[in-house]
């Protein structure tokens, strides 16, 4: 829908008068002076009377004068001109608003930081809510949540979570799937296609019958963790798997349901995760369990379930496998280590003895057994062994070499050959041995047969034991579906492709390094660092995402140098683009008054450039406003200057640039001729009479007030007479007042109260009851209601202690407070105090000595630096006079010693006074 000014006057005939048949025509009328110029065509300059300026126009134009009659066409043209002007004004306002918005957006880095802080605060609240149940078990310890917290932070950060299959960002409103092995997040359609393609590639060499019999796995694109085909994701669940299609909630972790996770911890301990539904691995179990150590000798202690296995560090003392020694290692997990000791042990046959580890008592020597077998004719040919040697291997029924005949012969005789043909299968597994029964292996097959090559394309007659391979190269495509086999005489089961894949990965930066394969390549394993402007904050993203990933928000301070007269910029965060304008105080010295400029820095103020060519009319496209950075002059000085008002009532601070006589707007206040009132006019200039600056002048007003003479000090009532000069009559009104103790109300005649002396006034204002006030010692005053402070002569019994507070007695309160009675320490107290003083003195002396040594070392180091290297051209006749150690350091030693002595002296007399 177009704006009204665009809809009005559309078409080529805009500005023409409408015909009588097409619509109502406007009647001619007078043309105002402001619209006279509208009767000329656009671009023809005119003067204020509607006459074309001389020397302008298009040659000999007919628009040279304004004496033309006013017609309907002229009135219509004026209306169109007004619409055009309105259109021009609307465009101008829109451009100004756009420029203002652009300037605000360009210099709103502080607002962006405030928005970032709000987002960070919201994220912190969600994280705290997610980890509340866990931190309540760990007393606020977050050290075990570092890995899980990283996954949760990446879930909140835009562009941080990337699907490795399609190399695209994972958004909050997209269905996702999380791997249970590496916890990587993928788009649901991407992982479904990946699983389908992986199963197809694995099962493609098989027949249709075998395909249904096996459940071929598919791997995770990142960690290669294998899943069954039945585990292919088909529905979108939250991280904990409780809610299907979790709703999008801005106050929850993206793709979570907000419920407690309740997944079992790994390794399984019987407890479940306490966090709210979250990405990434579950943290270690925070539950407390009571468990004993590995050797089960120590008492059970409460420990975290995730670290429940512990060692008491006591010797294990379990019997080792050797059954002779005990384990000396500290309490440990699992079986004990083999015995580390060495002992003399016999071999299995018992002939040899050797020093061997106690953990391996069984060993064999290299000698043949040699024992006589039960037959009595042969000896045992086994290597050193345990137990009986067994029967003679040549005794009992034996077979001939071809295994066709059995013989029962003594062990001393060999089995003869039977004379029959051997008939054993040869190595070719097709023919049998044609020789007579013989000892030893059969010969190779020498029969000639018609052999077919491995690929089945050629045949040839040749010896059976020789293989036949033709020279034909296989033309089949390997399993990668890209390269030919080209193996000579291939059997059809072509080997896998051994070339490198080399296809460009989804990142468009690297090529696949794997062996040539079918289907999609695995995602690029590389990561790219996306840095902020100062390169201190780095965000690792999968390769290929660096072009679309926004740089991370850096919290470091911007290090760009200042471009104004200030030495350094205000502290603000690292950013791209120009720095925000300086907001520091200008502090330039003003020319007129030498004060410092207090306004914000204006060296680089953004000012709209003036003097640009203006459009001649609405038909021209207005040029975009241009802003330039210009140093503005300092504003007028606003430093307050003390200035006296006209009536000399006050000295008020006025701005430095406007300091001068002024009216303070107060009443004049000078005493009038009556002597009772003052001038009530607003502060004005007064001419002094006879040099008296306290009397009213001729400019002051006359007195018209009532009597305002001062009453007696105790009388609060006004005089009812008009203003007069003599004394006022006595006051007879009753006054309600409080007694001295402020408890009872007393009614006294105003005259009596005001005319009474101090003693009589004290009696009049007393309620004659006991004073309720509390003395400084804490006891109640015993006197009758009285004026002033209570007496401090308290006779209440209180407890008194000696200075070291070892001895105590009961004494009168006033005597104790005035210090007339004191309880001195006895000899026991003095001994205790003396020992304490000696210990303190030793500590102070040690501190003084240590300080002296430190100052000595610093002084020597300082002098060594001052001396520097000796010059080679130093005169030989100079004699260096060395000062003694006391002359060098007596100042540095005496000052701390005197200070410590003064402090000890003051402390001692303070304790004595107490």
Curated annotation (Swiss-Prot):
Gene Ontology cellular-component terms listed: membrane; nucleus
Protein name: NF-X1-type zinc finger protein NFXL1
Subcellular location: Membrane
GO biological process: regulation of DNA-templated transcription
Coiled-coil stretches: 830-879
CDD domains documented for this protein: NF-X1-zinc-finger, RING-CH-C4HC3_NFXL1
Signal sequence region: none
Organism: Xenopus laevis
Homology family: Belongs to the NFX1 family.
High-level lineage: Eukaryota, Metazoa, Chordata, Craniata, Vertebrata
Zinc finger region(s), NF-X1-type: 269-287, 322-341, 375-394, 428-447, 455-476, 480-499, 507-526, 674-702, 715-733, 777-796
Biased composition, class Polar residues, residue ranges: 59-73
Region (Disordered): 1-120
